[in-house]
Amino acid sequence: MKIRIAARGSKLSRIQVDMLGEKLKKIGIEYEIIDIKTKADLFSTEPLSKLGKGVFEKEVNEAVLEGKADIAVHSMKDILSEINPSLEIFAVLERDPPYDILIAEKNLDKLDSNITIGTSSIRRKNFLKYIKPEINTKDIRGNVDTRIRKYLSKEYQGLILAEASLKRLNMTMNYHRLNVYDFTPEANQGIIVALGRKKDEKIKEIFKEINHKDTLDEALAERAVISLVGGGCHSPIGVLFKKEGKEFYGIASYSDGKKKITVSISKPGDPYTIGSELGLLLKKEMKNENIIP
């Protein structure tokens, strides 16, 4: 049997598909890749904030819904909290490091004033502004290779990226891992997900064999948070869960650049309940600070 996998045509997307494909090969399943151009690819120089939601996933998911592919593969942080009702999460791979990293000559504490750090994420911009208000940020688009090239050409004095991207691309840049209390990652950062059609029971059963349950539980808990308070590349909210045995350890943070709210939780339970509880904690604190009505 051969599975048709839809994904963006970028180098990183190809690597992510091949990571999943290797898991399929181990259970005797072949795969082929179907390259899809997304809105984010077609408007690669536009700020993400101007492109709307779902810019990395919509066209890829449509290929599955239209029967042109069997599976859509994404970096899970790029998919909306509300998945198309005809689609379902079939599997996730074991999580890569979920952290944000700083690529710069010095670590965060020792950065000079008035330098420019490249990031298009409002979450990263606000967290950085809260810690280091004297540092400037500037939007940066393009794949990881392009961003690093701009940094090396001194267009930026630093970059903030996802550590998982560098790991998957096997890049050996020196970097500084950012503390999760200072830079709480975007929900589902570091997770590769496979989406399929709900009705495809045969394919769904195949993907159960490669699913990493603890990672899926962490992902679902984080998604429960953002379904209550918002999240994604347009949101100033970060959330991270770590599951150890039956225990969930979670942190969620919000910042507008001037003030910061962080809440945490540690308890056993099911992902949705634990995530919802953390989301309600953050929502309560945001209301107390008059951030939301």
UniProtKB/Swiss-Prot annotation:
EC number: 2.5.1.61
Signal peptide: none
GO CC entries: cytoplasm
Keyword Cell inner membrane: no
CC cofactor note: Binds 1 dipyrromethane group covalently.
Protein keywords: Porphyrin biosynthesis, Transferase
Keyword presence, Transcription regulation: no
Pfam families tied to this protein: Porphobil_deam (PF01379), Porphobil_deamC (PF03900)
Function as written in the Swiss-Prot or TrEMBL entry: Tetrapolymerization of the monopyrrole PBG into the hydroxymethylbilane pre-uroporphyrinogen in several discrete steps.
Miscellaneous comment in the UniProt entry for this protein: The porphobilinogen subunits are added to the dipyrromethane group.
Protein name as it appears in the record: Probable porphobilinogen deaminase
The organism of origin for this protein: Saccharolobus islandicus (strain M.14.25 / Kamchatka #1)
Gene designation: hemC
